[in-house]
Amino acid sequence: MFDRWLSRKPQPLAGAPAIRRQKTYSGQSGYVYQYYYEGHRPYKCDRTSGTEYVFDVSADRKTSLAVSVLASDTALEDWEGRHGRTLYASERYAIAKMALFQAFDERPNPGAMSADVLVRAADVEAILIALGIE
């Protein structure tokens, strides 16, 4: 009963483009997804904190759902420590977007997209290697 009163409302999203552009991705799962980038905000869950990137995703052009990509500070700082530099905001966004594409490819159907996409340290390394970022 008190959970509703004690829970904090998430911060508003920042960084959304002035004009939303619908983009399309054909997943290896066989589904074609349309998505919009809605923005990002800090998140804190249990002992983990980082940045939440929110995308509005649809696979049928009729219904959509908000998909959160959670990039933990620990995963990003691990890469930064090993490479001796700080990731730019655009590189962090690229990691989130590529993690979203990976979820489109690996999850069996659009219904599975309702679960958060978690970015691990190994994901950060693999994504940045694929993008040619050192």
Summary of predicted features, one role per range:
Residues 1-134:
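Extended, alpha-helix-rich binding/interface surfaces that flank or overlap catalytic cores
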